[in-house]
Amino acid sequence: MTSSYVGRFAPTPSGYLHFGSLVAAVASYLDARAVGGRWLVRMEDLDPPREVPGAQQAILETLERYGFEWDGAVERQSERFPAYAAVVEQLLRSGLAYACTCSRKQLEGFAGIYPGFCRDAGHAREDAAIRLRVPELEYRFVDRVQGEVRQHLGREVGDFVIQRRDGFYAYQLAVVLDDAWQGITDIVRGADLLDSTPRQLYLQELLGLSQPRYLHVPLIVQPDGHKLGKSYRSPPLPAEQAAAPLTRALRALGQRPPAELAQASASEALAWGVAHWDATRIPRCATLPEERL
């Protein structure tokens, strides 16, 4: 079976894959393969100072050990900086973006909503971040799992950074450009990125890019409420007996694998997942406690 579906898994090499990463990878892989679609891997290595040496290779080796097979070459955002730079220049020339010299201290107390201090200041680009002007509009989309999401960009976000003061490019810009460049039709990822999706919709609209379908899976959280992640020293995935974590990930996604699947090979566990994938079973919630899985 062939399909126009193109999905992707885009890990950040600031650490190794953990169980939360696996849940997102399984969801994106099965959603693509269940309809005969393509599944790409992209390294979101936008922030070299935070990258852990050897993490990129370790991530790819883990995916292989866990039975994942991707299509095409692995793309890296660090190789796409000229494309990002061209769009930043375009937005600056058109007056849709501007230089911002605000420090973190100046922005304390604004709950992450940019108050517009530099919007009409006319600062030079040197030693400044670049922010995108946002409209006083509400953006909405229907997530395949989380349902309708609404966000007023002006009131809830404010003008947001597309290039940092240190010269590195912001995730919001890079992810929109790369998804369009790679022809991604369906984005399956963790619910921690649900809130940033309206900013991406605005960028897509501004740049005349097509809008993918979105599916945000619940985040796996630790007993203290923090998501499983590299920042909280979540343990890396075990190198052996991959079918057991894969089976657990299937259960986290609301699928119903037989108990004996945990003793199978990784490729058999994923093949079962492809054959039985039902995205409507994914829990409609933002978080899932790890201890309940």
Curated annotation (Swiss-Prot):
The gene name reads gluQ
Swiss-Prot/TrEMBL cofactor(s): Zn(2+)
In its UniProt entry, the species of origin is given as: Pseudomonas aeruginosa (strain LESB58)
- Residues annotated as binding Zn(2+) are C100, C102, Y114, C118
Q: Which InterPro entries match?
A: Glu-Q_tRNA(Asp)_Synthase, Glu/Gln-tRNA-synth, Glu/Gln-tRNA-synth_Ib_cat-dom, GluQ/Sye, Rossmann-like_a/b/a_fold
The family this protein is said to belong to? Belongs to the class-I aminoacyl-tRNA synthetase family. GluQ subfamily.
Give the note describing cofactor binding and stoichiometry. Binds 1 zinc ion per subunit.
Q: Which intervals of this chain are the motif 'KMSKS' region?
A: 227-231
Give the record's keywords alphabetically. Aminoacyl-tRNA synthetase, ATP-binding, Ligase, Metal-binding, Nucleotide-binding, Zinc
The record ties this protein, via Pfam families, to:
tRNA-synt_1c
- Tell me, what is one Gene Ontology molecular-function annotation carried by this entry? zinc ion binding
Task: Give the record's GO biological process terms.
Answer: glutamyl-tRNA aminoacylation; tRNA modification
The entry's cellular-component GO terms read: cytosol
Give its E.C. classification number: 6.1.1.-
Question: What name does UniProt use for this protein?
Answer: Glutamyl-Q tRNA(Asp) synthetase
The free-text function statement in the UniProt record for this protein reads: Catalyzes the tRNA-independent activation of glutamate in presence of ATP and the subsequent transfer of glutamate onto a tRNA(Asp). Glutamate is transferred on the 2-amino-5-(4,5-dihydroxy-2-cyclopenten-1-yl) moiety of the queuosine in the wobble position of the QUC anticodon.
Residues forming the motif 'HIGH' region are 11-21
Record-annotated residues binding L-glutamate?
A: R8, F9, A10, P11, T12, E44, Y171, R189
Which residues hold ATP?
K230
